[in-house]
Amino acid sequence: MIKTTVVGSYPVPSWLPTCSSQEGLRDAMLAVIKTQEMAGIDVVADGELYRWDINHAETNGMIDFFVRPLEGVEQLLDPERLKVWQEQPGNSFRKKPPGIVVGELAVGALDLQADYELYRGLTAWPKKFTVTSPYMLA
């Protein structure tokens, strides 16, 4: 028998930006999973919501999720650099700066195990955990 599954990211629920917390993220993931179960999908996915970041809603935080852990990237800026960043046109919608390259880029580490643990207990159905493809990172 051929099993059904889904591909790609689910849209972020409209209420998540106003309820952005670990509990809100868990509830959003649960809504995505239960929707798939009710539709009869055999192998469910979390909709890639584990990458959500309220500070970077225009990309759901997906780009920063992969960039922040790299060596040579900082997100915490000294007050002077933070002020310069905040004054740039187009940054007013962000609460925090994105990852900013401050040196030579080098290998970083993702904690995908912790992200999977957030999702694992939400369903007894067969599940898959999505990681991005290399072209997204290029």
Feature map (PLM): residue ranges:
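Domain-level signal for soluble alpha/beta catalytic cores
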Residues: 1-138
